[in-house]
């Protein structure tokens, strides 16, 4: 595939006629299972009904009521595990393509210049958010709507977190993310980049200047394996960030071996194929029936020509050769490649939050409140799923917990 395809979305968008046609397949369930299955409460049942009746503005309002990153989630959500898994239409033929319908609506919103969000009143005092990833961005919208003056502090040069630095542009175009963030800033949310807690500012400083602080730092650092400590390998998150920042203009090997089977591994493999790598192989210790990658990402990688080997774990490495053993069966497999990339997990840098007593990438909370009652946490660093839509969910719920705490509405 030509290199410029890195900037083109792999999945085509619905036209208005195709969107209405797809929405007309909906059985219009009274108590829609798809809506119950959405972690962010985006309410697909309601916005699909609006599409069916050609009320695209109403559909956009439904999405934005609960999801400030509706256009992002439309593209990156594992819908087959969530809303589409509950679709009643699946019992007839196939589930409604909810993600593409949501993408159609949010694209229509952007193209027609809708302004659903309004500026906040900022009457209830200041709240600081650490991290401009999906949890922090969603929390800022919820808090602004409640009347708070919100400032997000982001360590990178641009906001977005993993959405900007990790997800390939053929899955999430930069223009889509930029539009989401511009919409949030227009509400009155202040985003201060190049501000890292533990470097340019401290948690104590933010506590002194704000009524509450919400920590939403993500799992931005890639993990390695001891076996590969002295090998010439690249960590998956570093590769994805390098490709994204260069808009795909990077040197590509003739062959690549990715170790890992999650969504990040699939993103690495798909990126390599889109950019022209001839032979890309993913080797994962999980077998196919328990594969961690979403079906959408797995299928997309396979369609691009990625080879996937399941049930093998690395046991030895020599130069560009890796030897694997099957997790259940006897026998070994040795593979060589021009480039080896590790996609075996990610971790957060929480040294600056030692007073919150983080343990293994997690800050313990009760109703999102940490051991310090003024400090809350959400996103990847709290227990639960690590998808974007769950980050949106926790960001919204943490914002509501902050509001209840500050207003004395609960004893959380």
Curated annotation (Swiss-Prot):
Protein's UniProt keywords contain Oxidoreductase: yes
EC number, as in UniProt: 1.3.1.1
Alphabetical GO biological process terms: pyrimidine nucleobase catabolic process; thymine catabolic process; uracil catabolic process
Residues annotated as binding NAD(+): 286
Classification via Pfam families: Fer4_20, Pyr_redox_2
Subunit structure, as described in the record: Heterotetramer of 2 PreA and 2 PreT subunits.
Key words, A-Z: NAD, Oxidoreductase
Protein name: NAD-dependent dihydropyrimidine dehydrogenase subunit PreT
Domain of life, per lineage: Bacteria
GO MF entry, a single one: oxidoreductase activity
InterPro entries per record: DPD_II, FAD/NAD-bd_sf, FAD/NAD-binding_dom, Helical_ferredxn
Catalysed reaction equations from the record: 5,6-dihydrouracil + NAD(+) = uracil + NADH + H(+); 5,6-dihydrothymine + NAD(+) = thymine + NADH + H(+)
Gene designation per UniProt: preT
Enzyme class: oxidoreductase
Induction and repression of expression: Transcriptionally regulated by IscS.
Listed GO CC annotations: dihydropyrimidine dehydrogenase (NAD+) complex; oxidoreductase complex
Species of provenance: Escherichia coli (strain K12)
Family of the protein in this entry: Belongs to the NADH dehydrogenase family.
Protein task: Involved in pyrimidine base degradation. Catalyzes physiologically the reduction of uracil to 5,6-dihydrouracil (DHU) by using NADH as a specific cosubstrate. It also catalyzes the reverse reaction and the reduction of thymine to 5,6-dihydrothymine (DHT).
Gene3D superfamilies, per database record: Alpha-helical ferredoxin (1.10.1060.10), FAD/NAD(P)-binding domain (3.50.50.60)
């Amino acid at each position: 595939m030509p290199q410029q395809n890195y900037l083109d979305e792999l999945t085509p968008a619905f036209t208005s006629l195709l969107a209405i046609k797809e929405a007309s397949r909906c059985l219009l369930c009274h108590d829609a299972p798809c809506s119950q299955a959405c972690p962010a409460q985006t309410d697909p049942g309601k916005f699909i009904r609006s599409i069916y009746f050609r009320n695209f503005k109403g559909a956009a309002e439904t999405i934005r009521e609960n999801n400030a990153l509706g256009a992002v989630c439309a593209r990156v959500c594992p819908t087959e595990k969530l809303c589409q898994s509950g679709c009643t239409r699946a019992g007839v033929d196939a589930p409604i393509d909810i993600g593409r319908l949501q993408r159609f609506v949010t694209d229509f919103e952007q193209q027609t210049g809708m302004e659903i969000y309004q500026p906040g009143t900022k009457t209830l005092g200041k709240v600081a958010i650490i991290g401009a990833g999906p949890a922090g961005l969603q929390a800022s919208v919820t808090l602004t709507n409640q009347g708070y003056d919100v400032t997000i502090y982001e360590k990178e040069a641009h906001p977005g977190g993993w959405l900007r630095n990790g997800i390939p542009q053929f899955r999430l175009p930069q223009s889509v993310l930029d539009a989401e963030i511009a919409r949030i800033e227009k509400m009155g949310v202040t985003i201060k980049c190049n501000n890292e807690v533990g470097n340019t500012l401290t948690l104590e400083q933010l506590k002194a200047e704000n009524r509450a602080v919400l920590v939403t730092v993500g799992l931005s650092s890639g993990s390695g394996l001891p076996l590969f400590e002295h090998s010439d390998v690249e960590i998956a998150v570093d590769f994805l960030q390098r490709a994204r920042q260069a808009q795909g203009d990077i040197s590509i090997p003739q062959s690549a071996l990715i170790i890992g089977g999650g969504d990040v591994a699939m993103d690495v493999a798909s990126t390599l194929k889109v950019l022209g790598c001839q032979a890309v192989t993913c080797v994962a210790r999980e077998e196919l029936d328990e594969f961690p990658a979403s079906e959408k990402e797995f299928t997309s990688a396979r369609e691009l020509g990625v080879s996937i080997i399941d049930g093998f774990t690395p046991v030895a490495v020599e130069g560009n050769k890796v030897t694997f053993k099957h997790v259940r069966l006897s026998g070994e497999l040795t593979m060589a490649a021009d480039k080896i990339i590790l996609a075996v997990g990610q971790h957060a840098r929480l040294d600056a939050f030692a007073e919150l007593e983080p343990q293994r990438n997690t800050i313990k909370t009760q109703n999102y409140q940490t051991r310090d009652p003024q400090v809350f946490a959400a996103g990847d660093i709290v227990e639960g799923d690590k998808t974007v839509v769950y980050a949106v969910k926790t960001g919204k719920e943490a914002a509501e917990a902050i509001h209840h705490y500050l207003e004395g509405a609960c004893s959380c």
